[in-house]
Amino acid sequence: LARWQYHFENGSTEAVLNALSYYQNDDGGFGHALEADSWNPKSSPIQTWTATEILREINFTDNTHTIIKGILHYLESEKSFDGKCWYKLVKSNNEYPHALWWHTEIDSTDNMDYNPTACLAGFMIRFAEKNSELYNRGCFIAKEAVNQLLADERENGMHTITCYLRLMQYIEEAKAADIIDLAAVKARLSGLIHCCITQETTEWETSYVCKPSQFFDCPGSVFYADNQKAADFECDFIARTQLDDGSWNITWDWDDYPSQWAISKNWWKANGIILNLLYLQGFGKL
């Protein structure tokens, strides 16, 4: 609700931060179903990444604020970190209602998947004190992540590609272009994003697919030109597929915990409403 009010009803940044703070644990990490497909109250890298996305959505960059300081403290503590990557999957998820894809028998990076590590490294570079130990660790992780990306060592899905995109954006915002080869990263991401977007638009309404809004929400994006047809189509698609209750269809399902999934599904619907309207707004359609 605070996010909606911020974007569309002149709501305050403070209201969003206050709501977000209830999901933050004493260790600085986030839990409590902020990412609504896992009800694990304990801190995890994925839930903490979700918090960074909300901060980015409201353009909040004050690194003296307790929320950002807490996140940096959590990352510095190296909880759920194997020395190279933060765990994408944490075993404590199993103790609470969750989607099948968050179930795991061991804490795992999912075979060195840089989701959410690339984004978290970028967050460190953007908000830690420059040349601090934490900043330098973020730089090291970023270089390792980019090496994997450019070496094409693994197939990266849309969520991992988005984490690399965030890494690039954070580095640009930190004016730290010397850390990685930004031009090479941008070129690689351009190709990956185009290939990742589901061009068969008949699948969009009923399948869990990748749409342009996964990566950008306005024509000013450097990735718009190569994906203009699909991006413009998405505006029409959003307008055409709104349900009678004002929301949009959720194209995935937990296949377990039906009572909790019914609640999480509504949380996802609320999130989808905000993101869809922001996309239309970015394209001048509101």
Regions found by a protein language model. Give the residues of each.
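Preference for long, amphipathic alpha-helical scaffolds in soluble/luminal domains
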Residues: 1-286
